[in-house]
Amino acid sequence: MSKYYLGVDIGSISTKAVIIDDDLKIIAKEYLETNGAPIDATKKVIESLKKQIEKSKEKIELYGIGTTGSARNLIGSILGATIVKNEITAHAIGTLSRFPDARTILEIGGQDSKVIIIRNGVVVDYAMNTLCAAGTGAFLSAQAKRLGVKIEDLGKVALTSKSPAKIAARCTVFAESDLVHKAQMGISKEDIIAGICEAVAKNFLNNLCKNKKIEDKVIFQGGVSKNIGVKKAFEKLLDKKVYVDEDSHLFGALGVAILSKKNSTGYIPFDFNIKDINYKVRSNECNGCSNNCELISVYDDKGIIDILGSRCGKYTKTVSWKLT
């Protein structure tokens, strides 16, 4: 009987999950919005995986469960994960499984972005931007709504532009103000959208890729990788081909599923029914820096399970996760 492995990537904007077999083939997958409720989102993606498995009439026995993403400790505790890993490692492993010769990973998610430099199959450098929303999936969604365009159509509309507008995307406030100004000037919606896509790519490269050598093969991943306009903008600015896989938005979940396979110690009795757990939530504002993040502490009678909402990663480093 084949062995299978579950990977879950719980982000602030979206939650992704995959089940892979011993050959690293994805046999079930799901991508849903987190909507500020990581536990509920996880229940939904696991339920979806369960239905896909039942439909295929395949008997699934798990030999590994992995979690990654901003709520990885919390969800790892709930699922009884055998491995919990940071996003950099998970995304790199997921990418290398599809692109063994990858040397640069550009990743833009819902509220953060990152560049990962790989040499000889090993991560040698990386940079993350979790402090500014400009250029993230949430930013693009907000601008699409403002312009009356479906987010899934944003990239296609951008490709119809003949003269992309110059949009200042260094800050969401400036970008939105500039967008309104350009519209008032009579610049077409297509040119504004193309300008937004180019601004996102330019902002990413200027902020995250300073002093970093971007070498082929360049892989674009994360939810925003599905925006063909941003992909084309990266290719234009880098003068390189940028690759996007059909599962590029799932690479974090794929990567941690692969890691759970590598660290498997045997069969895991998991019935895909997440039981309700007793936990408490306490919110408070962190005054450690000018971000003033709204933190959400999740804990049970044994202590803190996870702290969510830290944009600088301060509390990700201090929360210890233990398999119970």
Map each language-model feature to its residues.
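Glycine-rich phosphate-binding loop plus the immediately following alpha-helix
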Residues: N35-I39, N120-S163, C171, K262, ...
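Glycine-rich phosphate-binding/hydrolytic loop that grips phosphoryl groups
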Residues: I93, G137-S141, D245-F272
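Conserved phosphate-binding/catalytic loops in two-lobed NTP-binding clefts
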Residues: T82-I88, E235-L254
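Adenine-nucleotide phosphate-binding core of ATP-dependent small-molecule kinases
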Residues: A175-K210
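Glycine-rich phosphate-binding loops at beta-strand->alpha-helix junctions
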Residues: S70-A71, A199, K210-L237, S248-F251
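Gly/Thr-rich phosphate-binding beta-strand-loop-beta motif of the actin/hexokinase/Hsp70
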Residues: M1-D23, A102-R119, G288-D300
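Short glycine-rich, Thr/Ser-proximal phosphate-binding strand/loop in the N-terminal lobe
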Residues: Y4-K44, D125-Y126, T130-L131, R311-C312
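Short beta-strand-loop/turn "lid" adjacent to the catalytic site in phosphate-handling enzymes
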Residues: D21, A28-T34, I53-I88, V124-D125
